[in-house]
Amino acid sequence: TLEHYEIGPGIEYIKIRYESVPLTLWATTIDMTNPYNVIEQVQSNNSVPDLKRELVQDMSKRLTTPGHKVCAAFNHDFFSYDEGVCIGLNISNGVISMPAGSGRSTFAITQDKTASVFFPVPECKAISASGDEVTIDHFNWGAETIRNGDCVLFTNMNSLNLDAEGRYIKIRPRSNWIVNGTPTVCDVLEVSDLPLQTSDTDFVLYLRNTKLNSLPDIKVGEEITISQKLVAGKFGTPPDNILQAFHGYPSIAYEGKLHDGEYNDFENGREYETSCRTMAGMSQDGKTVYFVATELSENSTGINCIDIANWMLAHGAWNVVNFDSGGSTAIVVDHTMLNLPGRGSLRPVMDGVLLVSTAPEDNGVAHYSFSKTQLNVPIISLAPLTLISQNKYKDVIERNVEVEGFAFRCEPAELGWVDKGAVFHAGETVMSGKIIAEKNGITAELPVSTRPVQDIHIAADEILIDSVRPYRINLEGNINGQVYTLDPAAFAWTSSNPSCCRIENGILKGIENGETSLVGTLDTITVGLKVIVEVTPETLVHENFSDLSDFPLFSTVSNTLSISHEELPTGWPDGAVLQFDQKTGRNPYVEMGKSYRLYSLPDSISLQLNLSKEALAAIKHIRFDFTHKNGKSYWQPEYIPSDTGDQTIAWAFSKNGIAFPTEDFPLTLDRIRFVLNPGSRSEITIPLRELKAYYPVKASSAINNVHIENNFAWITAEGELRLHYNLQQTGSADISIWTTAGQQISEYISNRELPGTYTYNIPDRFLSPGIYILTIRANGK
């Protein structure tokens, strides 16, 4: 469980990750007995039909007003692109928007906030003051061919310009609408043989063909009553006073089990189709409602509706229905879509589900909650904590609350401790307890259980550190084959040479050049680590080519290979010139075989050279061959020159933007190879100068000629598009993608994590060609 907390009055939100599948799942649980929440069905842009449709996050934002805060939203019904309408019966605030089409089950919410599932059969009528009545065949029309019925009620959601021949009666309701309740009395505003139009307040009853002369005595100023009724069909009983209803297509589970004859009667066997999904469920008493959404992405596999229904049954659902899936699937919290689109792009939809707080606006903090309801961690492990602030109604005021000013304690104290960055350090004893956070007299509690861990060890036997970057000892343990990072601060550490480095809470900081042996003890457990400290300068020239007496050279295509100080380029105070003739041969290259063990932990390395036209034509690429501390081949970056004259080859010691692990240093440059283009050439000269390493001058900066860290985040595009970011302190990152028009189309908020470098795979595959803006907020920037 990644997150679990209340996002509104009686509205619980949970995010779960099943790594073994893999699957990411979101669920909301709504306590319908809470007086400050409602569930609403809404049409895109409040229009039927609506060929434009609307993103769920835009529905959420548009319909949030004071006292009507949309806490979460989901996509809902299947729809027709051409007609601009949903395919089943839906009810919005007591008004039927479209009555049947391909409809199957209905998931309804009554006026007293009770959920039910049934197969609906509409029986709707218009009744005049004189007692004449006519059956309403249809509600609203589609954009093209769905023009059903000889008696049609066009509601205030109608977006068509009515122009068909027939008889028109414009009406205005005196009260709210309801289905299976007291019929709605309306005033007759106009009666005409010419088209009349609907408005936000006015409906139009349209009569034609066999019903053209129905309600013959209706007059302006009289009453007309609209009765909307749903009667029993194949299963279930429609309740009284239905306020909201959602087409459920096939009923997947009914009365606690899979609904035989319904779940397995999905066209083309779609019940077994694996995709991302949105589904709805209810408890047996109808007072708890569930909505579930899953993601389909590179990191989350598809799943069928049967498996989701069984998951929901196991977690309290009694009836389960199926909403639209695939590219339409969307869960939105705080107007932000949480899942990645499942079919390659953001898809506007025809209608949605809103989970709404009707509580009065209140920005006063009355509650703090942790982002999880339970924490299960290994002993002596580290777990960053996240706090949420809420008002007295449980509306969220702020996520990822700043932890400054909080006092933390653990009960019992042996459970562990919480540092000033709100990182929990689990104790060394297996137990259960709780973490208590308190600020301004308001407390939050988090139940905690710690588990035993085996095979506790340090990941490396020997480590090289510098005098700038702190290094947390990489302590690991194992639970059932899963490796966990443990807390080195739980150990008592001794050093054979304390003058070269300092250790505090399991974190090393180099002081002066030297070596030490560290020993950590915890009860009967002992671990050891050899530490070498090499204090960093700003730069260090590893080769200035002043001494050429020991400079091994090798070539597959030259017998005249040499290096000298003759004929240096103008303005060069030092350096050397590599000179050779090239004869025809296979695999042509020239190699400088001198080896350089790089001092300390450089950020990057550079080599200056000067290329003539002849040298540029000869060189295919220049390759540096590095080995890591164990002597194995590690990295072979290649530089392809594209111009003549002075130039600098430079590489950062990173992969995909992430710095090489400290555990891999020291690195050794074994050779520099000039790979040549085929052919024969005479008197090729390559001037070389200053093989130089660059080092950080402080912990948060780096000197780097290629890989620039202007702030704390950078993007790489080597194979996949990735965003990399540094957390300088325990915290989270908020990453968003925007259009140039300022529309937010994706947001990802990481869990609170320990200081370090992290990677986010940018979901570019769902973006259409164009220009986008990516923003990241972390470290208070």
Task: Label every model-predicted segment.
Residues 700-705, 713-714, 723-725, 742, ...:
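Terminal processing/anchoring signals of secreted or surface-associated proteins
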